[in-house]
């Protein structure tokens, strides 16, 4: 048995790169291992023997067992009387005179005719007792042969979301986070991977990251849908499993094992009835009332008690995870706080500035990277992104970022340039006279355009005939004369 279950431990082993959150792991991976382990237990014939044993003559033993295994067994379901109590409750509180009259009947068939409810109460087991053919209701145990197949189908059902996400994920996290998940990293590898991650997140993959995150949210929603589908499936297969078994589980905390045996026997009876027709030599049919023991139900009642609690637990977690996902999508401030938990005290303003230009998809990929890389490297990655954002702002056109000095008024221009020596080139000298109506950004920009020249003369030459440099004061005095 251990050799059969051992390969499942490799499935639960933590991978180098994790692509599932803890709730997803519980819902898919852990549930699959539990269900497959239960399947192996039920199929272990050496521990529980034959799946069915029927009481019959030695000559017909194999035939009867094969017939009842193939055609199925049944029990007599508990009926609710007019006061709302079950058959065994009715018998416990039956009037003394009625019970006395019943005990005076010598035949069991007469007892059935007199009081079938009480006759079934004193029968062999819950659901096994005398019946009136064609009148008494029967509940066939058609699931018994297929329990291990049901568990196997459930394991495949719960595996589907994780398989779908693995296909959609396409090893993106493995490519981003390989070689940097350890506590100690080679310096060259550290720097190389840091530069690659920085370039990746600076490359603006927002639409791809958005699709990536939405696909993961869809797989989480699929987990919830599968949990609900599983509830319905078990309730149909096991004839009201969720309602009946809650009473059995309620008996465990108070150690009421009689109630436990009674309630579990209504879903997983250990003893059941089987009916077979045997024809005589002349063709007259005879009905054989056969009693069968169902050994696997001893294990089924324990397995499904555990699965009852586990399925409720993971369904609740899956619903809470969907609510959390909706909250994270709608609340940027919550995304900021969650990301800061992986940054070891990085200033909040820096993180906010990095996330200001990032959407939910970018944040989701960053969170996935944070749980797969070295914490120091992840913090340095965010610092690099912050530095690149500031550098990008500084390398934008100067008029958009750098402040300029206040432009002097036109009246102050003569005094400002009174002692300045001007260039010999007339075309460059023209640009030194400043248009007072120009904005300060246009004045600071050298590469984009020149400042508009002040309209004076068509050809402005500040050079004397002997190449003497004329001062600005002299130029203004002569021009106004």
Swiss-Prot record:
The chain crosses the membrane at residues 22-42, 145-165, 221-241, 303-323. PROSITE patterns: PANNEXIN. Uniform expression in the imaginal wing disk. Expressed in an outer layer of the pupal developing CNS. Also expressed in pupal retina: cone cells and primary pigment cells. Residues 43-144, 242-302 are extracellular. It is found in: Cell membrane; Cell junction, Gap junction. It holds the Pfam family Innexin. The keyword Ion transport applies. One of its GO terms (molecular function) is gap junction channel activity. Keywords: Cell junction, Cell membrane, Gap junction, Ion channel, Ion transport, Membrane, Transmembrane, Transmembrane helix, Transport. Residues 1-21, 166-220, 324-481 are cytoplasmic. It is a multi-pass membrane protein. GO terms for biological process: intercellular transport; medium-term memory; monoatomic ion transmembrane transport; phototransduction. Belongs to the pannexin family. Structural components of the gap junctions. This is Innexin inx6.
